[in-house]
């Protein structure tokens, strides 16, 4: 959990925002997945947002659903994902690692056992996409017991009560939604979210990272100009994996070429 705090402190000193890529663990297979993650970090990723393949991904657009199917086709299991997380943590001791996932995966293991496992392998945060704030007590309590930051989504239409709850319960960072709906680079992030960012700051929420539809450097810059601490990009990255699925070296080169300008856009 502390890794987020030290990251945001360092970025502030350097007058930079955070660029955070999302990928699905095990896509397109364990070995290439590890290479992808190394490449993202080498290219400038400040933190990682990682998905665990799940059979019914509600909030995911077709791009990320396909990533899940590729991981399943490679025989990737949640247990293997935790082994991969432990390897990533060994190799990269300081980078914040977040999981973005669904409640069923937590229930399958048992809530407390799940967060204990996260702590053991060095996961810093967990966002459970299908658990609203008002139902989050057992999740966030288990998370805090195991030094894992509970992450909450702040939708563009959040009212004052919700903003106060997110500020009160969230740790690590706040996932600021560019718009409602499913993820996807096709639906470019729209409105600037200045008013939400201002409110979150007023209520001392964890730093907001804007996600959903972030696929170009100008959007990263716009998110930071609106007061966000950085931006999360998922579908655009997963699409690169899909496009070069049979050319692993080209895939890594294309990922590097995508991430470098995205990170550069975080520097003021």
Curated annotation (Swiss-Prot):
The cross-references to PROSITE patterns, in alphabetical order and at most eight, read: TRP_SYNTHASE_ALPHA
List keywords of the entry alphabetically: Amino-acid biosynthesis, Aromatic amino acid biosynthesis, Lyase, Tryptophan biosynthesis
Protein family: Belongs to the TrpA family.
- Provide the function of this protein: The alpha subunit is responsible for the aldol cleavage of indoleglycerol phosphate to indole and glyceraldehyde 3-phosphate.
One Gene Ontology CC term in the entry = cytosol
Q: What protein name does the entry list?
A: Tryptophan synthase alpha chain
Q: Where do the catalytic residues lie?
A: 49, 60
Keyword field contains Amino-acid biosynthesis: yes
Q: The organism sits in which domain of life?
A: Bacteria
One Pfam family, short name: Trp_syntA
**CDD domains recorded:** Tryptophan_synthase_alpha (cd04724)
Report the top EC class in one word.
lyase
Q: Which reaction does it catalyse?
A: (1S,2R)-1-C-(indol-3-yl)glycerol 3-phosphate + L-serine = D-glyceraldehyde 3-phosphate + L-tryptophan + H2O
A single MF term (Gene Ontology): tryptophan synthase activity
Q: What pathway does the UniProt record associate with this protein?
A: Amino-acid biosynthesis; L-tryptophan biosynthesis; L-tryptophan from chorismate: step 5/5
EC number(s) recorded for this UniProt protein? 4.2.1.20
How is this protein organized at the quaternary level? Tetramer of two alpha and two beta chains.
